Amino acid sequence: MRFFNTASGIKEEFSKDSKKLGLYICGPTVYSETHLGHAKSYVSFDILKRWLTYKGYHVTHIQNFTDVSDETAKGALREGVDEFTFTQKYEKEFLDNMALLSNTYASKYTRASEFVGKIAEETKKLLESGEAYQTDQGVFVRINQDDHGKLLRVNLEESLAEGTSDVDSGPKESPHDTLLWGPPLEGGNSWEVDGLPPGRPGWHLECTIMSSSELDLPIDIHWGGIDLIYPHHETEMILAEKIGLGHYCDFWMHNGLMEDAEGKLSKSRSERVSLSQIFEECPPASLRFYLLTHHYRAFTPYTPDSLLRACQEAEKLGINAVDCMVVDPTDPRDDDELAPLVSRFENALADDLDTPAAMNVLRDLDVIAGNRIKQNGNLAPISGMYSIFECVLGLFS
């Protein structure tokens, strides 16, 4: 099987000697409702995980929650509650929505707040080694021009133009230096650690510490949206090297974002399309269906009309599926009419998770299923084929 590796910019053969895999996906910063962009990212990742499991791998899936950030502190202050009381509300809302979308649960969910001690320890080591420096706005790590570009594959000036982060603001020696330990924030929790001023951990180091604490290195596959390539994933990888972790990750995979009729949905516009709003008009299973009709790396168009059409098609395709899946399944590979469909389906997923091609197989299966139902034909292998779609794509659950 071949996956697109952001680090190389090409599809690469994915082959491991061990059947045990470690996968890490950057989780949400839990300060607002789960939105359409979240659905795109986590459904796409779920297909990867399901496919690898189907192929016989034993997957350890780690996902974090960023529960210490500028946004969580501001939200807690706004609502007049403790920061962790605030974030736990949105953690639950996120997990409830992921379950509605039929996403599988992570092997373990980590929280930035649980790793503050380790983050502080590594920050102090970087200060002692001279890799980091302290200002009145926090502790920053020095990042040189040559450190960047392993994921973006551009030079310093170009990567600076790609994006900035509020988390990285402050009196820095270089624009690319990144915050390791920031000052206390109104509304947020802070920690007192010997050797550091009272404060809070920085975003990028949080993920480096959480992932390396829970998974053997190198991580087999690290996933996130393309908006996380820079500065987050670039910096996460650099920090892993600076704290002595060595080669951090073998495969970096990134999903595209959502876009509307005017073009790419910005983060703020995407967040305004909450899943609770969408689920009032469209069942979660239909949204999952819609997302799978687009490749994970592509920008996925969103309009209410396009989603409505997907709902209608998903409902139509589900009719024959329900009728067939009441029959005990047999292996569709033993059925001359279905064996080619199994091959097409598996080849599609093996080619960088080509779910649009896999969905075309589903449409062809629907035709065959309809004919056999009319002719009182053998539905057992049809049921088996639908079970594969249920297992790998999370449809018809």
Question: Could you say what each language-model-derived stretch is?
Answer:
Residues 8-104:
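N-terminal, positively charged nucleic-acid-binding surface of large information/translation enzymes
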Residues 1-31, 46, 117-323:
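Alpha-helical recognition segments enriched in aromatics with Gly/Pro capping
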Residues 76-83, 107-113, 197, 225:
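The substrate-binding groove and active-site-proximal loops of carbohydrate-active enzymes
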Residues 50, 212-213, 367:
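Short glycine/serine- and small hydrophobic-enriched flexible loop segments
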